Amino acid sequence: TAALAGYILEDDLEASLRYLAEINEAGFNLVQLNKDLIHYLRRVLALKFDPQLEEVFKRELTPDEITEIKKHLSLVKDPNKVIDLIKSLIRAYSEMRYSPFTLVPLEIAIIENLKG
C-alpha cells in the first residue's frame, strides 16, 4: 500500500498502473488494497494538517510505517488534490465491491487523478 501511495503522490501514473497490474496478476484482493490505500492516504493528509496526530498514529503503527507516512507527507504539495483522490478512491471502492471487474474502477480513479 505504501509503495502504491508513493507512486500516486509522486504523480507517477505509469508506475501506479504497473503496480496495480502486478498486484492484480498475483491474485491480491484489490478491494482490500483500495480500502488500505484510502486509510493510508487519510493518515498522510491528517498528519499534514495536524502533526500532533503522530502520537495517536504511534499507538497503531510501527515506527517504520510512521517514517514512511512522513516521507510521503513531504510529497503532498496540494492537499486538495489528495482530498479529491481520496473521494475518487471511495467511489471506486463502492463500485469495486459489486463489479466483476474490480481492477477497472480503481484504475480509472487513479488515471483521472494523475493524468497530465
PLM region spans:
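Extended, largely alpha-helical regulatory/partner-binding modules appended to the mid-to-C-terminal parts
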Residues: 1-116
